[in-house]
Regions:
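A composition-driven surface/loop motif
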Residues: 1-136
């Protein structure tokens, strides 16, 4: 079993996991998965910044020009295309050492009795659908 989720959906998945009321080992597994996803999210944030910097106009020293806390982007359309592709890339957390954690968290989601609504309902569905591989 593995968790395979798009970069753009990692933050929502973390929020859903954080709202689950769990005890004991299930709580430990949830926290472990949150840590793994948080590490991936940090990578995504850094890579997004790097991508934006690569499209930013540069000053005489080769540093990106920032105006009103935003990069001065030279090729906006190309950046948007790359960002869309980047956000749709999937992060994979393989079973391996995390097999028990992934199965436990999926089971916790199935047993969850929270009535999700709005964006949280979409985030819950996206997270649940990100689990792949069944009971291998």
């Amino acid at each position: 079993m593995q968790l395979k989720i798009e970069n753009i959906k990692i933050s929502g998945a973390i929020e859903i996991l954080d709202k689950l009321k769990l005890k004991g080992l299930k709580s430990v597994h949830r926290t472990r998965l949150i840590r793994l996803l948080s590490d991936k999210l940090q990578e995504v944030i850094e890579e997004e910044k790097s991508l934006k910097e690569s499209y930013a106009a540069k000053d005489d020293e080769g540093k990106p020009i920032i105006i009103d806390d935003k990069y001065d982007i030279e090729e906006t359309e190309k950046l948007q295309e790359d960002l869309e592709a980047f956000f749709n890339e999937k992060v994979v957390i393989d079973g391996g050492d995390n097999q028990v954690t992934i199965k436990s968290v999926k089971q916790s989601l199935e047993e969850c009795d929270i009535d999700w609504s709005g964006q949280q309902a979409y985030d819950y569905a996206n997270l649940y659908e990100a689990f792949e591989g069944g009971d291998e």
